[in-house]
Amino acid sequence: MRKLFRYLKGYELQALLAPLFKMLEACFELFVPLVVASIIDTGIKNADSVFIWQRCGLLVLLAVIGMACSLTAQYFSARAALGFGTALRRDLFRHIDTLSYSELDGIGTPTLVTRMTSDINQVQSGLNLTLRLLMRCPFIVLGALIMAFTISPRLTLLFLLATAAISLIVWCIMRATLPVYHAAQNSLDRVTLLTRENYVGARVVRAFARQTQELDAFVQTNDRLKAIQWKAGRISALMNPLTYLVVNLTVIALLLSGGREVYTGTLTQGEVIALINYMSQILINLLRIADLVISVTRALASGVRVSEILNTPTTMADPAAAGLEPVAGSPAAAFDHVTFTYRGAGGPSLTDVSFAARPGETVGVIGGTGSGKTTLVDLVARFYDAGSGAVRLFGHDIRDYSFAQLRRMIGIVPQQAVLFTGTIRDNMQWAAPNATDDEIWAALEIAQAADFVRGKPGMLDAEVETAGRNFSGGQRQRLTIARALVPQPQILILDDSASALDFATDAALRAALKEKTRGMTVFLVSQRAASVQRADHILVLDDGQLVGDAPHADLLRDCPVYREICLSQFSREEVAKTL
């Protein structure tokens, strides 16, 4: 948690000036009861209107100066807190971007969103209050006690007892609420998760008529969050009644004891009023300390959660090495007895997989659901590191490549087509910011997307809405394929990225890829046998094991798993025609 304070770098002056101006304001506030006492004991007692007006003018002056100091302090504290939050948010985003898929899978997207938004906002708010109140409130409490002592040392004992009682109440309540606030933030993660799942999967929920069940699950989770927050609220609600009870009892004791001392001439009426005002100042500032502690408690809990992410080391360090040159005659991609297990999984997703893909080859990857197809190409792209064995690209261990060089070498089209807000040109230039229109149109032609892009108003400047929702599923897939083709990578991975295309468009896409990407190694992942049958060789996966690695005809003859896949999609006569 202490490491977070480094994000105040550059705002040290503001962080110093904010509490100093608040303490200056507090000094003026401590003089107010003495001025009021002088008005009562001198001005009112002697019916001296001039004196009264002078002292009232002094009160106004103290108020104006105090307000100016307060506004200045708030300006500095807000600037420091905003700078802190901005720097922390930037570094957290940058750190999350370095985490491997393994860490991201373990943490979860909803948790990361909550850390980035709600938790950082809590820390920022807590810092803002701390800069303004951490020194001011204790200073006023201590100052009020000293000022009261100068008026009546005996009655100051009542102040000390009241202050101790209120402090004990605040401490007990804070101790009880700290774990509750932490539990509330964890419960908020769950609410965020359910909300995201239902918004992203809204069509699936409706297709299976699961609205009622999902609503019930959300209501239960939301009610659990409400119950935790209600518990924290009930505990916190005890603070004001208990503290005001202590203060009111103290004021009664002050009036009784002070009245006797006024009667005996030990104290004046103005001094009794000053003591009561100092008691009020102590109460107000102890309550502010309580609010500060609540805010700091939440901020600390949130800060710990943010620190957990910042302290999560990536298991995939970037070697940041100089560009590696291909080893002559080496495969574009090769697996050497690779085994991989996802974090928390009961067994490996890939087991002892070995193969080689030569430069310029089209490699089909096929298998049933859960057979490990996506896992295999994720290892080629180094989204994960192999648990054992080695993955090599162009003769070098994949871990020796810098991420920058690796991303230039590999173009990836994921299963879920993702487009970003902007224009078609903006999306096409993601991997190649300096790509020309001719290069973009060439990629669109290969991806079978040029015709519908030309039909859009503005063509390459046509707007892309959030998540590409103004395009059909097939159009989104073709645009993401084109985006991967624009930088002309050495290796292209198509991870079941033509599932929304009709057979004619799919066939045209495969033909264009084979004709116009010569020299490019293409991994074509699909559950359609028709999509991979013309590949140079096909990797057949079954429950994480490589059970076939050969051209289509050889696999039909020698691989029962591949033959079963083909016969499940075509008749025997149709299969025979493919030979």
Would you name each region that the model predicts?
Residues K9, A15-T72, F76, F149-R154, ...:
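Transmembrane helix-loop-helix hairpins at lipid-water interfaces of multipass membrane proteins
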Residues G10-L13, T98-S102, S118-L127, L131, ...:
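An intracellular "coupling" helix at the cytosolic face of ABC transporter transmembrane type-1 domains
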Residues L92, I96, V205, V306, ...:
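Helix-loop junctions and hydrophobic alpha-helical segments within the transmembrane domains
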Residues I96, F218, V306, F335-H337:
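Conserved catalytic Walker-motif region of ABC-type ATPase nucleotide-binding domains
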Residues F5, L13-L34, R55, L59, ...:
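Alpha-helical segments in transporter systems
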Residues A47-F51, M147-L161, K231-R305, I309-L310:
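Helix-loop-helix
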Residues P326-L579:
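ABC-type nucleotide-binding domain
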Residues G10, Q14-C27, N128-A183, L256-L267, ...:
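Transmembrane helices of ABC transporter permease
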